[in-house]
Amino acid sequence: MLKRYLVLSVATAAFSLPSLVNAAQQNILSVHILNQQTGKPAADVTVTLEKKADNGWLQLNTAKTDKDGRIKALWPEQTATTGDYRVVFKTGDYFKKQNLESFFPEIPVEFHINKVNEHYHVPLLLSQYGYSTYRGS
């Protein structure tokens, strides 16, 4: 009986794992923040995804970075469409929690999505008085 239970448990886990991996891969947008001053990930930073609209920006989703400075799935559950987007990193609050000043209270990074079947990764290398970003993989 125990052997049958173990076999069923392993089989169930094996079939579930591809579904979990596939769900994470289907999300087309991820971000990652590294603090260049400490060399460590920037955890608990609020990041907002917005789409360019006729009269400004339309908020699509908001999330916080995990302990590794990542949001692995920032795109909302709705279907992706081509267009102009931006992620806004709320960095002022991050530094304020550490009793540090920052020149940039927010860092908006605009980008264009032209292929909804590709993955887009936006890394942010951050310090109190500067930042760098690029299209990651």
Swiss-Prot record:
<dbReference type="InterPro" id="IPR023416">
    <property type="entry name" value="Transthyretin/HIU_hydrolase_d"/>
</dbReference>
<dbReference type="GO" id="GO:0042597">
    <property type="term" value="C:periplasmic space"/>
</dbReference>
<feature type="signal peptide">
    <location>
        <begin position="1"/>
        <end position="23"/>
    </location>
</feature>
<dbReference type="InterPro" id="IPR023419">
    <property type="entry name" value="Transthyretin_CS"/>
</dbReference>
<dbReference type="GO" id="GO:0006144">
    <property type="term" value="P:purine nucleobase metabolic process"/>
</dbReference>
<dbReference type="GO" id="GO:0033971">
    <property type="term" value="F:hydroxyisourate hydrolase activity"/>
</dbReference>
<dbReference type="InterPro" id="IPR036817">
    <property type="entry name" value="Transthyretin/HIU_hydrolase_sf"/>
</dbReference>
<feature type="binding site">
    <location>
        <position position="32"/>
    </location>
    <ligand>
        <name>substrate</name>
    </ligand>
</feature>
<keyword id="KW-0659">Purine metabolism</keyword>
<keyword id="KW-0732">Signal</keyword>
<feature type="binding site">
    <location>
        <position position="70"/>
    </location>
    <ligand>
        <name>substrate</name>
    </ligand>
</feature>
<dbReference type="InterPro" id="IPR023418">
    <property type="entry name" value="Thyroxine_BS"/>
</dbReference>
<comment type="function">
    <text>Catalyzes the hydrolysis of 5-hydroxyisourate (HIU) to 2-oxo-4-hydroxy-4-carboxy-5-ureidoimidazoline (OHCU).</text>
</comment>
<feature type="binding site">
    <location>
        <position position="134"/>
    </location>
    <ligand>
        <name>substrate</name>
    </ligand>
</feature>
<dbReference type="Pfam" id="PF00576">
    <property type="entry name" value="Transthyretin"/>
</dbReference>
<keyword id="KW-0378">Hydrolase</keyword>
<dbReference type="GO" id="GO:0051289">
    <property type="term" value="P:protein homotetramerization"/>
</dbReference>
<keyword id="KW-0574">Periplasm</keyword>
<comment type="subunit">
    <text>Homotetramer.</text>
</comment>
<dbReference type="InterPro" id="IPR000895">
    <property type="entry name" value="Transthyretin/HIU_hydrolase"/>
</dbReference>
<dbReference type="GO" id="GO:0032991">
    <property type="term" value="C:protein-containing complex"/>
</dbReference>
<dbReference type="GO" id="GO:0042802">
    <property type="term" value="F:identical protein binding"/>
</dbReference>
<dbReference type="InterPro" id="IPR014306">
    <property type="entry name" value="Hydroxyisourate_hydrolase"/>
</dbReference>
<comment type="similarity">
    <text>Belongs to the transthyretin family. 5-hydroxyisourate hydrolase subfamily.</text>
</comment>
<protein>
    <recommendedName>
        <fullName>5-hydroxyisourate hydrolase</fullName>
        <ecNumber>3.5.2.17</ecNumber>
    </recommendedName>
</protein>
